[in-house]
Amino acid sequence: MSIYLDYNASSPINKDVIEYMVDVYSNSYGNADSRTHIYGENARNIVENARKDIADLIGVQAGEVFFTSGSTESNNIALLGLKQYANDVNKKHIIISSIEHKAVLEAARSME
């Protein structure tokens, strides 16, 4: 029996999620930002329903859920928000651990 411990980069996907995504990828190939046709509308509905489901799951408003292209973009957005907050409350330092993800370290270094 093996045990997978590297959940930082990837993780196993729930079988229900795989089944749902296969259906989406097979039948809903419109661009969610192209709402001038039914394919875009269908894709937009899928995205917005997912946003609402996630918001309900974590107890926030749907407008507070943002989708990004991946962890690097998410880390950058979070750190830029933290930097703005630190500036607003007149704090001069953000402390980052040396064992953080490379994207976090690089984003923090760019703020020095």
What role is predicted for each listed range?
Residues 1-112:
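Pyridoxal 5′-phosphate
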